[in-house]
Each structure stands twice: as C-alpha cells, then as structure tokens.
C-alpha cells in the first residue's frame, strides 16, 4: 500500500478565534431555539438587542482606543458575549436591563482590561451578577413556560412588555400559570417552598413540574447538552471542565439527597434545570478565564460544580452558576501556578 508523504512542516492547523467563536455560536442555536419555543419570542428579542448593543459598544471603544474596528469585531467574541447575556436575561425583562448588562460586559469587563484575551472574568457572567445584584426583582421575574401560561404572549405583546408600553397590572397577568401562581425557575420555586416549610416532594407537585424536571427546562438543557457534545466532537472545547462540573454537581447533590430527600433537590433536577448545561459547555469553558492544564481544568470544573451545589442549596440564589464561574475565574491563576503540567523530558530525582 502506498502512503502519500507531505513535505514538512507537519503541523496541525489551529482554529482561528473567529472560527472557534462561530462554531460555539452555531452549537448554541439548538438551545436558543428551545428557549424560544418554551418561553416565547422574548428570548430572541433580548438576544438581538444585546447583539446590536455589543457590536456598537465594541466598535465605539475600539475607535476611541484607535484600534482596528472591523477586524476586531469580526472575531465574533462580542457576538458570543451578547448571545450569552441575551439568553440569561428573563425573556420579558425591560429593554434597558439587557442594554446596561451588555455595555457593562463589553466596555468594562472586556475592553477596559485590554480586549479579548486580557479579561480576567467572563464578561457575560460578570454582567449577569451585576444585574442580579442591582436589579433583583427584574432579574428574577422569569416568564412562565407558554405550555402552562394562563395567557400566552404573542410577539406583539412581548414587544409591549419589553419596551414598556404595557402596564404593571397587565404584565402581572401574563406571568401567571394555570395554578394562578407566578413563578421564576423550577429551582427558585423549590427554594421558596422549602423556606415556607414545604418538602421537596410537595413542591414538585406544582404545575411547573408536570414533566418532572420543570416544564421546558429539561428540553432546553438537553438542547444545550447536544450542542456541547457537538463542540466536543469538533474539538472546539475539551471535556475536562464540563465533565468535572457535571460530575461534581451530580455527586454532591446525590449525597445531599440521600441524606435528606425532603430538603434537597435530586441530582437529575440539579443537572437539567436552570443554566446547568449552557454553563458547563458554553460559559465555564471560556479559554481566556479558565485554567489551562489538564489537571487544572479538572480542578477548575470541580470547584465550579461544588460551589454551584453549595450556593443553590444554602445560599440566597437558586441558580448559582454566574457566582461560581466568577469565583473560579479568580482562582484560575492560582490553579495554573500550582498545578503545572510536567515538562517534556522531566525526570524525577533519585
């Protein structure tokens, strides 16, 4: 058998930043589509608004810094940040919320540190935490899934809700489910019920849990999981961080559930509710703000998974990925310093 031998250098071509970002965005599309299907047109409107603000803000800052505008914007990093912010914002949140968050992410968290590759925090998660602390009411008013909403919103009503032409009384009616209760996320519902003295099993009897995991949230997480697996197949990301997050979260939640099933959420609900899959595959794997070595990435992911469980279970926020990712970003330089790969040719001393 004849083998064709190419001339040197025998180097593997590395993906350019633009190509990597494009592939990540394409792999996120199934999850975005699932969110739009279950939570309405507001998801798409928030994403589009975030994209416009992100690209405009990045172009303005680059022009002020006298940097190349078109070549920098075309790397798609601002586009990806905008998409992550858009899907993290409640679908019918007021328009100014996503504008403030996107400006904060692009101008302060990314460009103020020098641009792509220089920021120490994940811009989308930093913006999310800033908004959550500054505007807790707006950031925790998540839409009822259209399948159990008393009054599902069409695109016209969604635009009215986002851009402020709908009264507060009208808006409250569109946030009610079939049981007459306005809810946030499944995890938030359980956390609120536990604080009222109900057990986990009693909380799971509500309409939002009619499919066992939280209507819509299971399929949204499955869609992001599918996109994440495609990224692994395309070698856009490595498996260490994602699997460390999911594995540590599963182990911690299983242990807590076995000890006290009445006051703890089961592992499957932890994995397929909230932002678990999008955070594990699309957010925590950001190569700029994560650890770099194999052991470092495993430790980085495990740290996020454990912190998510602790904050979800004992903290004041039901979905803790943004806080966990930012805290892990702080620890990434420390992890890289102390967890270094063995140098090629290294020999242990006798």
From Swiss-Prot:
Cellular component per GO, a single term: plasma membrane
Which keywords has UniProt assigned to this entry?
Cell inner membrane, Cell membrane, Electron transport, Flavoprotein, FMN, Membrane, Phosphoprotein, Translocase, Transmembrane, Transmembrane helix, Transport
Q: How does it sit in the membrane?
A: Multi-pass membrane protein
Which regions span the lipid bilayer? 37-57, 68-88, 89-109, 120-140, 212-232, 239-259, 265-285, 291-311, 315-335
Gene Ontology process terms (BP) = electron transport chain; transmembrane transport
Q: Which InterPro entries match?
A: NqrB/RnfD, RnfD_bac
Record's subcellular location: Cell inner membrane
- Similarity field: Belongs to the NqrB/RnfD family.
Q: Which NCBIfam families match?
A: PRK00816.1, rnfD
Q: What's the protein called, per UniProt?
A: Ion-translocating oxidoreductase complex subunit D
Organism per entry:
Shewanella pealeana (strain ATCC 700345 / ANG-SQ1)
């Amino acid at each position: 058998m004849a083998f064709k031998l190419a001339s040197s250098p025998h180097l593997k071509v590395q993906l350019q930043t633009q190509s990597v970002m494009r592939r990540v965005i394409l792999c996120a599309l199934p999850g975005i589509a699932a969110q739009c299907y279950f939570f309405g047109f507001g998801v798409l409107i928030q994403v589009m608004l975030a994209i416009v603000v992100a690209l405009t803000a990045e172009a303005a800052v680059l022009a002020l810094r006298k940097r190349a505008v078109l070549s920098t914007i075309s790397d798609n990093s601002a586009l990806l940040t905008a998409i992550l912010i858009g899907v993290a914002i409640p679908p019918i949140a007021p328009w100014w919320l996503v504008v403030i968050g996107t400006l904060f992410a692009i101008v302060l968290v990314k460009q103020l540190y020098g641009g792509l590759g220089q920021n120490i925090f994940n811009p989308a998660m930093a913006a999310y935490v800033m908004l959550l602390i500054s505007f807790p009411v707006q950031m925790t008013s998540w839409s009822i899934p259209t399948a159990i909403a008393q009054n599902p919103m069409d695109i016209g009503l969604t635009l009215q809700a986002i851009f402020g032409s709908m009264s507060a009384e009208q808006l409250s009616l569109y946030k009610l489910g079939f049981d007459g209760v306005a809810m946030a996320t499944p995890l938030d519902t359980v956390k609120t019920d536990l604080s009222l003295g109900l057990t986990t099993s009693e909380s799971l009897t509500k309409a939002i849990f009619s499919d066992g995991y939280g209507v819509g949230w299971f399929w949204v997480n499955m869609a992001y999981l599918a996109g994440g697996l495609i990224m692994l197949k395309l070698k856009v990301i490595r498996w260490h961080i994602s699997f460390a997050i999911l594995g540590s979260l599963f182990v911690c939640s299983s242990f807590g559930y076995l000890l006290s099933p009445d006051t703890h959420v089961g592992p499957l609900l932890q994995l397929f509710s909230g932002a678990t899959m999008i955070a594990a595959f699309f957010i925590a794997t950001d190569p700029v703000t994560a650890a770099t070595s194999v052991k470092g990435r495993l430790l980085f992911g495990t740290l996020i998974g454990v912190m998510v469980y602790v904050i979800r279970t004992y903290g004041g926020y039901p979905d803790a990925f943004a806080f966990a990712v930012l805290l892990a970003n702080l620890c990434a330089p420390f992890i890289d310093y102390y967890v270094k790969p063995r140098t090629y040719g290294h020999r242990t001393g006798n």
